[in-house]
UniProtKB/Swiss-Prot annotation:
Region annotation Disordered: where it falls in the sequence: 12-33
Compartment list: Virion membrane; Host endomembrane system; Host cytoplasm
Organism: Rabies virus (strain PM1503/AVO1)
Topology in membrane: Peripheral membrane protein
Note: Most abundant protein in the virion.
Name under which the protein is recorded: Matrix protein
Keyword terms of this UniProt record: Apoptosis, Host cytoplasm, Host membrane, Host-virus interaction, Membrane, Viral budding, Viral budding via the host ESCRT complexes, Viral envelope protein, Viral matrix protein, Viral release from host cell, Virion
Length: 202
């Protein structure tokens, strides 16, 4: 057991803040079907409260014995309670984390690193979302641990408003990203101006 603890310590960054623990995952891992507000987005006609952000997202999954998406999804279900970043941008962070984890990981020692570098278009409902010109630098480690297994997620997201042409962030409703957004309780509503688009409520 002590050997496992030493191995685990090596795949954590020494400069990260104290990780947030998460309770044990359930045994079942039912396939989640997306709610109707997650719809494929087409070209937006409304420019109301629409902003382009250049985003960088890194999610590093650390586990000496490998990991399953069942555990990652369980960790993300506690996201609202353990999120330590700017709450005006929590919706943006959830979108970036979901898109990053739906990509292919790059092995890095005993870590698996998911990266996202993209300019994305976000729309917030009413007066929600970040302040004009507001930027985000968010970093947090979240862990799940018991006597036999350890899984740590190191999440880093940076975002700044930019004028480069962006892409719509919503993708195939049957994608892994939509499952992860549901796990993180991403709050959206259908736009009245663009019936095929979703507005962030957080």
């Amino acid at each position: 057991m002590n050997v496992l603890r030493k191995i685990v310590k090596k795949c954590r960054d020494e400069d990260t803040q104290k990780p947030s623990p998460v309770s044990a995952p359930p045994d079942d891992d039912d396939l989640w079907l997306p709610p109707p507000e997650y719809v494929p987005l087409k070209e937006l006609t409304s420019k109301k409260n629409m902003r382009n952000f250049c985003v960088n997202g890194d999610v590093k999954a650390c586990s000496p014995n490998g990991y399953s998406f069942r555990i990652l999804r369980h960790i993300l279900r506690s996201f609202n309670e353990i999120y330590s970043g700017n709450h005006r941008m929590i919706g943006l962070v959830k979108v970036v984390v979901g898109l990053a984890l739906s990509g292919a990981p790059v092995p890095e020692g005993m870590n698996w690193v998911y990266k996202l570098r993209r300019t994305l278009i976000f729309q917030w409902a009413d007066s929600r979302g970040p302040l004009e010109g507001e930027e985000l630098e968010y970093s947090q480690e979240i862990t799940w641990d018991d006597d036999t297994e350890f899984v740590g997620l190191q999440i880093r997201v940076s975002a700044r408003q930019c004028h480069i042409q962006g892409r719509i962030w919503c993708i195939n409703t049957n994608s892994r990203a939509c499952q992860l957004w549901s796990d993180m309780s991403l709050q959206t509503q259908r736009s009245e101006e663009d019936k095929d688009s979703s507005l962030l409520l957080e």
